[in-house]
């Protein structure tokens, strides 16, 4: 029916319907009794508009997801160990975007995607044993943790095979991620120096100094080791980028140098020795990959860390003295008192090894993913602080084998991209390959599978590197 055929009265009512609804909505907000009630009335339309805007372009949900993931703290809601975070809601929007644009996905399933699927399947396979040995409530929490890890896998799949707007520049999005990372590291430095009130769900990690007690730098993450691992990731990027031509990197060299100092300073404030070891392992890998003199790479990395150490010495001298004493004692007592150097990890590993020796059948399927810290089934509540041992006990040989296979696929995919003729793929491939080599070293002293706040960033770089390696040079 043409507009002319519609009676004038109906056209007038239709034209007035939307303005009238907006007016009534505005009046309801104005007359609402309190600020929270006003927010409740205003939120649904504003949220719907934001979701609609996000879905208009393929990359928008991902950009919003990373901003919320890295730059917002958890909400002070008493649910779980660390409160509730808003980033999974953005991941749900991303899932909706993927469903809407289903026809734009690449249909080929590469072997690395299958490796991710096998590992998630192994985690899910352990959940019935979590319910059997530790109760259904703990099994439900373990299922949620598998879901958090699955978010990182979805980000990887999106970067690898998801919809992409024509003319998309991976280096431009890398620059965006880099800036977001710098903001997160800057906040971590400010948080440590000024000791802001801790966000909900933070770990109680402190450094005892002669003139007081300081909370280790955690930034907007849940604990200090996550921050240290995150800073190590971008510090490796700075090192890789400084060895490549300007046209192949996302930022100018002076900017990379300044950012490297920020990440190195935040890394020192996190008080994480394992993250420094990861950076050194990544540098050795980079030197071997580029067939460069290892001294050149290590000298540049050491210079950056020394400058950052000088900044720490200037602003927080008592912390610097304690930090260097800790490093010195780590070398001095490594053979004399290894359990003390490893902050009790050796005793924990011995306990878990004894548990598997006494109950070898649990080494097949495990006792349930992420049950060790919350269940006394192994004798007492334990934090393994070792990704490999934790997976062996909690998911059995099946889970550990799937995880090792996944790591092999990650290294193989990163190495193939690093050797690509596509300069973007080569840069991203060198970055993720070298970092993941260091990551596998750091896994010996931490359960890095649970770092769901930072794994999506790592897997986006991995997926983009592999995708760019298959694109024309």
Language-model-derived ranges and their functions:
Residues 335-395, 414-419:
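Long extracytoplasmic/lumenal interhelical loops at the membrane interface
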Residues 186, 192-196, 270, 287-336, ...:
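A membrane-periplasm/extracellular boundary helix in multi-pass inner-membrane enzymes
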Residues 1-131, 168-171, 175, 241, ...:
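Transmembrane signal-anchor hairpin modules in multi-pass inner-membrane enzymes, especially those
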Residues 394-440:
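Hydrophobic transmembrane alpha-helices and their immediate junctions
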Residues 46-51, 120-124, 128, 154, ...:
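Alpha-helical transmembrane segments of multi-pass inner-membrane proteins
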Residues 85-94, 114-124, 136-161, 181:
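Aromatic-anchored transmembrane helix interface
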Residues 234-237, 295, 409, 431-473:
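Transmembrane alpha-helices of multi-pass inner-membrane enzymes
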Residues 40-47, 85-95, 144-156, 226-244, ...:
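Hydrophobic core segments of transmembrane alpha-helices in multi-pass, intramembrane catalytic enzymes
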């Amino acid at each position: 029916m043409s507009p002319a055929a519609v009676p004038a009265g109906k056209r007038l009512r239709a034209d007035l319907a939307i303005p009238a609804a907006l007016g009534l909505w505005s009046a309801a907000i104005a007359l609402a009794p309190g600020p929270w009630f006003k927010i409740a009335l205003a939120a649904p339309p504003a949220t719907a508009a934001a979701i609609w805007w996000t879905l208009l372009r393929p990359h928008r949900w991902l950009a919003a997801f990373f901003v919320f993931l890295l730059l917002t703290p958890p909400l002070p809601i008493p649910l779980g160990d660390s409160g509730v975070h808003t980033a999974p809601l953005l991941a749900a929007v991303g899932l909706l975007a993927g469903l809407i644009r289903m026809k734009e996905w690449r249909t080929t399933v590469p072997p690395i995607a299958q490796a991710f699927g096998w590992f998630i399947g192994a985690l899910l396979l352990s959940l019935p044993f979590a319910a059997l040995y530790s109760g259904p409530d703990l099994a439900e929490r373990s299922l949620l943790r598998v879901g958090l890890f699955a978010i990182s896998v979805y980000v990887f799949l999106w970067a690898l095979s998801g919809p992409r707007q024509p003319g998309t520049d991976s280096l431009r999005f890398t620059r965006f991620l880099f800036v977001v990372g710098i903001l997160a590291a800057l906040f971590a430095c400010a948080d440590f120096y000024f000791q802001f009130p801790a966000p909900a769900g933070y770990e109680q990690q402190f450094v005892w100094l002669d003139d007081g007690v300081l909370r280790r730098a955690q930034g907007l993450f849940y604990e200090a080791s996550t921050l240290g691992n995150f800073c190590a990731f971008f510090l490796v990027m700075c090192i890789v980028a400084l060895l490549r031509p300007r046209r192949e990197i996302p930022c100018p060299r002076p900017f990379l140098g300044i950012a490297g100092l920020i990440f190195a300073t935040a890394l020192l404030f996190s008080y994480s020795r394992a993250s420094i070891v990861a950076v050194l392992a990544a540098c050795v890998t980079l030197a071997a990959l580029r067939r460069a003199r290892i001294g050149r790479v290590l000298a540049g990395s050491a210079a950056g860390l020394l400058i950052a150490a000088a900044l720490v010495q200037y602003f927080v001298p008592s912390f610097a003295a304690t930090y260097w004493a800790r490093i010195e004692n780590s070398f001095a007592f490594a053979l004399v008192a290894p359990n003390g150097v490893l902050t009790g990890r050796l005793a924990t590993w011995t306990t878990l090894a004894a548990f598997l020796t006494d109950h070898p059948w649990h080494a097949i399927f495990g006792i349930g993913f992420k049950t060790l810290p919350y269940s006394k089934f192994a004798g007492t509540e334990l934090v393994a602080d070792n990704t490999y041992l934790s997976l062996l006990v909690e998911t059995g040989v099946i889970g550990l084998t799937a995880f090792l296979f996944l790591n092999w696929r990650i290294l193989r995919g990163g190495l193939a991209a690093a050797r690509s003729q596509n300069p973007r793929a080569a840069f991203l491939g060198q970055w993720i390959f070298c970092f993941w080599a260091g990551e596998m070293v750091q896994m010996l002293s931490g359960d890095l599978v649970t770092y769901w706040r930072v794994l999506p960033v790592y897997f986006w770089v991995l997926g983009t590197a592999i995708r760019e390696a298959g694109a024309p040079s």
